[in-house]
Amino acid sequence: MSLLTEVETPTRNEWGCRCNDSSDPLVIAASIIGILHLILWILDRLFFKCIYRRLKYGLKRGPSTEGVPESMREEYRKEQQSAVDVDDGHFVNIELE
């Protein structure tokens, strides 16, 4: 005897959808939440690099330059740029004082 003959198989009526009364508020709420969850999950997977990079670095804009003379701002920009300039793919050693 095969195993399939020993297992009770559901009748054709039991395969049907049992949620014919879909006007139940709980069913409607669950459906809406499920659809929103699916949409948010898809958007998260598509844009996760942008989203998490924005969350991680978005608030860190650097030190405030309010009230600092323009000459000092320019000097600071040049120092920062020279610290991260890389030529021909070599690493730059930055020594902290």
From Swiss-Prot:
Chief subcellular location equals virion
Keyword terms, alphabetized: Disulfide bond, Glycoprotein, Host cell membrane, Host membrane, Host-virus interaction, Hydrogen ion transport, Inhibition of host autophagy by virus, Ion channel, Ion transport, Lipoprotein, Membrane, Palmitate, Phosphoprotein, Signal-anchor, Transmembrane, Transmembrane helix, Transport, Viral ion channel, Virion
Site keyed Essential for channel activity, possibly by being protonated during channel activation, and by forming the channel gate and the selective filter: positions: 37
- Origin species, per record, is Influenza A virus (strain A/Brevig Mission/1/1918 H1N1)
Regulation of this protein's activity per its record: The M2 protein from most influenza A strains is inhibited by amantadine and rimantadine, resulting in viral uncoating incapacity. Emergence of amantadine-resistant variants is usually rapid.
Intravirion topological domain: 44-97
Other known facts: When the channel is activated, one or more imidazole moieties of His-37 probably become bi-protonated. South Carolina isolate has been sequenced from formalid fixed-lung tissues of a 21-year-old male which died in 1918 at Ft. Jackson, SC. Brevig Mission isolate has been sequenced from lung tissues of an Inuit woman buried in the permafrost in a gravesite near Brevig Mission, Alaska. This sample was recovered by John Hultin, retired pathologist.
Q: Classify the protein's membrane topology as the record does.
A: Single-pass type III membrane protein
Provide the protein name: Matrix protein 2
How this chain assembles, per its entry, is: Homotetramer; composed of two disulfide-linked dimers held together by non-covalent interactions. May interact with matrix protein 1.
User: Glycosylated at which positions?
Assistant: 20
